[in-house]
Amino acid sequence: MTSANPEFTVRRDVPQTMRDGTVLRADVYMPRGTGPFPALLERTPYSKDNSPECQVGSPPFFASHGYAVVIQDVRGRFTSEGRFIPFHDDGWGPNRDGYDTVEWIAQQPWSNGRIGTLGSSHNGIVILAAPRHPEVLRRIS
């Protein structure tokens, strides 16, 4: 499903398949224009469907300023498949969901390959696995 705003569009429940076949889902806020765009990633166990202003950075704000913003439900939470074990599949257990998601973003036609992350609390901890992908990850905040 896609919803529109004069400055950006939102693609809801976009699937990303992890290395073990588990499907995680994200909302992707896309700026107007042809791209490609730099991207910001936030992964959350608190539901990507919460008010966008509840996120660390406002996805509508960043999307209206030229960034693609990916807000993903972590494994086993809300719209994402799998079993939720805090931090287990984010890079410290057998799977590398943060890495796989950064890789997925980098391969999208709308991505220019420059990716930053956002997050505090649990959302901030799960992005710590992302530095394993230094060639595309530009900023962690």
Which positions does each model-derived feature cover?
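Conserved SAM-binding loop
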Residues: 16, 72, 119
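Short beta-strand segments enriched for Tyr within beta-sheet-rich domains
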Residues: 24, 37, 136-138
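Cap/lid segment of the alpha/beta-hydrolase catalytic domain
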Residues: 32-107
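Primarily recognizes the serine-hydrolase "nucleophile elbow" in alpha/beta-hydrolase
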Residues: 42, 103-141
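A conserved hydrophobic secondary-structure block that centers on an alpha-helix together
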Residues: 19, 23, 88-95, 109-117, ...
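N-terminal cap/lid segment of alpha/beta-hydrolase-fold proteins
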Residues: 1-35
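Surface-exposed loop/turn and secondary-structure junction residues enriched for glycine/proline
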Residues: 11-13, 17, 21, 40, ...
